[in-house]
Amino acid sequence: MLTMNRLLLVLLAAVALPAHANWYLDNESSRLSFTSTKNADTAEVHRFLVLHGKVDAKGLAEVEVETDSVSTGIPLRDERLREQVFQVRKFPTAQINAQLDMRPINDLAPGAQLELRLPLTVSLRGKTHSYNAELLATRLDERRFQVVTLEPLVIHAQDFDMAPDFNALRNAAGLSAVSLSVPVGAVLIFTAR
C-alpha cells in the first residue's frame, strides 16, 4: 500500500508540474522576425537568431533579444544594423515584458488555443514603450505551449529615438527611403521546467 501511495504522489506531482512550473523559451524552436521596407516598395523579412526568455509561475513573461544576433542575409547590412541602429556595444539586448494570466493557458487541453489581447512593453536602446498585442496561445502538450502574434506589432523608430539612425542607415546604403515603422512577428515556444 505504501508503494501505491508513493506512486500516486509521484504521478500527481508530475501532472501538477506545468501548472506551477516556470516556462522557459526554446530558442531553437522560436522565431522573432521583422520586416523592413526600403525605397517605398521593397519589403524584406529579417530575424534575430538568439532569444532568451521565461514565464514565471505568476505569469510574468520576459523575452530578451540579443540584438547582435540580427540576421538579414547580408553581412554588411547586419553590421550596419548592429552599429548604427541597435548600437550593440552600448545596448546588447532588447526586452519584451508582459503579464499573463497562466490559469487559462494551463487549463488548455493539448491542441487547444486561446486568443490573448494584452499590453506589453518593449525596451530598446534605453527607452521603453507600451503596445497592445493580439496573440494566440496554443497548448502543444503537457509541457509546452506556443505564443504567436495574430497581428504584427508595429514598432516605430520615433518611439525609441531611432529616426536619425534609420536616416544614417539610409544614407550609408544609398537608398531613397527607409520606413520608420517596422512590423514585428513572433513564434515563441515555452517548455515547463
Where are these regions (language model features)?
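Positively charged n-region of N-terminal signal peptides that target proteins for export
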Residues: 1-7
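Sec-dependent N-terminal signal peptides
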Residues: 7-15
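Low-complexity, acidic/polar, glycine-enriched regions of mature
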Residues: 21-193
